[in-house]
Amino acid sequence: MKRTLFVIIAIVTAGACLAASPEQSKQFISPVYTIDKIYHSMEGPSSVERVYLGDPAAPAEVLWVTGIRTEMVDADGATPQLPELMCHVNVDLDPARHQALFGFRRATAARLMTLSQGMLTAKVPAGFGFPLASNEPLLLFTQVLNLNIQKPQNLKVRHRVTIDYIRARDLTSPIKPLFNVGASGMVQLDDNPLAMAHSMASMPVPAMASVTTDAGHDSTSMSSAASCLIGARAPQATSTSADYVDPQGRKMTGHWIVPPGKQVNHSDISWFMNLQFDTKLHYAAVHLHPFARSLEMRDMTSGKTVFLAKAENPPNAIGLLHVDEFTSAEGVPLLHAHKYSLISTYDNPTTTNADSMASVFLGLDDPELVVPNSDQLAHASATLFDANTLVLHTNIGTITAAFDREHAADTVIQVSRFVLAGAFDATRLIGQKNASIAVTPPMVRTSSLLQPTRLESGVERKPGTVSYCRPGGARMEATILIDMDQPKDPDSTCIGFARIVKGLDLLAAIQPGTSASIVNAETVLRPDAAPKVVAAK
């Protein structure tokens, strides 16, 4: 069932990030949830909605996300409800879109910010923020729980979520960019009686509601919104109950049992964080379950505590009254050569087993980001996500191809990223012996632009199909192939992403051993350039 998320915009005149920079807030009201019984963590009614901080139809501009908060309200959207009914709120990026828009070399984590029971507000230090394009889709996941009310009698409740941000155009001095990194405490799954086979695969159906982004990505690429875990489940563990597979090949889970009494769990998160450079920690949010006492992030190399978050439990009920967050304008150094661990402490006072998790969501200094201005961001957004045509300007004439974003969304973004960076400029169309024409941009131009792409069906390989071939195996460099005949043995590393609509006769003149020069390439939006494209079988 499609749900509607109501949006309210509020302007806060006194900026929290910079005194002279007014902070804006956008409010989202979740669907009405009915609480009719006891719901433990991740079991209650939930929804996933796509939201925007700006107008998705307008040219993109740079925003800085500075905070998030949620309030539990009645069905009317205004009357306060019990905070203890809050399970969690996740705000997730579309990682491929975000990475391409801002030109990141590193992989981008999906989870931007999160809230959970005991932590209903999160705010980065003044002068810091997470960069976001105004037309980027966010996935807003909200969920409720009920740990204490035995007869709730169909209690109606909603989340009222507020996201705070600053428009870059309103800044009077630069803001310091943060990037998001997450990590989870884990236990080994195999032969471990305390491990819980409780992952996304076993979540209630409502929490996995199908969502499709404007970039064409479906819920499989952004399904982390419906989980407190970090990132996607390990692909090696798709058919198992594992959430992750560590570098030693061990199946790990981020959910485990806390038996009666005290339990301390140590987890190496170095491989999880995968820091590529030295940085500083300025912000951390923590996700814990009832009976948690604390969560510590420790530098195992130096033996020093990075931060310690304490949790407060209610005296006569189950839940979390308060969980510390961490903020620091000065920052705590995190070194890529050091090892880091999460140490969770639980104390279960009951006579039965309890479930547990321990996750952190970090905001780190971003030394790599070159902040685009609004014109640059709008151009990048149009090139990467709006254009439907690839245009090659050559010495023999103009060649155009129609993109197929339906069957090759990630591949089109990858190729468009090359175009945006000028990787195809002053290259050559070279005739091949296998009745195809190849374009191979220099590796020095493409190596920093490569991003992981999921396996896509792509366009059927036949004369006129344009394919992207990933580097690997015998092919050392990223290559564009144009089929001039039916390929006899199609390369499985090549994904068709477009069809030639103009210039096929020009290409036919390029025989094996001959070539033509590409002056430059561009992507454009043409209303008449969308022929019917057949997906690969």
Task: Label the predicted regions.
Residues A20-A378:
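Beta-strand-centric surfaces of beta-sandwich/beta-rich domains
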